[in-house]
Amino acid sequence: VCIADDLVPPHRENNVITWKSRDLLGRIGMVFQEPEHQFAASTVRDEVAIGPKSMGKTDEEAYSIADRLLERLNLSRFAKANPFTLSGGEKRRLSVASMLAAAPKVLVMDEPTFGQDFTTWTSMVQLIAGARDQGCAVIMITHDEPLIEALGARRILVREGE
């Protein structure tokens, strides 16, 4: 309920909500199961900077955020690379970094830690926990039981579509 309070104005009989793309970007972030589906920039660094720039940050601020996240997720050496040239695990880390950079109020992630080694997995868990601790509601679709335990997350189990 408190998530909805931040996302949607109080209900009125004929409540029409018109959000601009920038408004949605600041409210909801989505990490797709197939990271390639969310890439929009020609370089890794630009991909992470899109969110902060769209939220009104200066280029300097946006690239500072991008550089920090690329460093944390061991992607700095790919800053000038095209996102589509990365390995599967690197693409997944890039997709998480690009959504975290926008600092949304709600972050929906589909299998965010799939294909990561332990060191990178740990960094991703710390970043996700940090976002959560700063007030971001995190919703994950995952088979990663250790991730759920590490975050102390509430679990909703779906079996056979129910």
Question: Model-derived features: where do they sit?
Answer:
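Conserved ABC ATPase "signature" region
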Residues: 60-78
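Conserved ABC ATPase signature
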Residues: 82-86, 90
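Hydrophobic anchor residue at the start of the ABC signature
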Residues: 96
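ABC ATPase C-loop
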Residues: 99-100
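Conserved catalytic motifs of ABC-family nucleotide-binding domains
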Residues: 103
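Catalytic Walker B motif of ABC-type/P-loop ATPase nucleotide-binding domains
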Residues: 107-110
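Helix N-cap at the start of a conserved alpha-helix in ABC-type nucleotide-binding domains
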Residues: 118-120
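H-loop/switch region of ABC-family ATPase nucleotide-binding domains
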Residues: 142-143
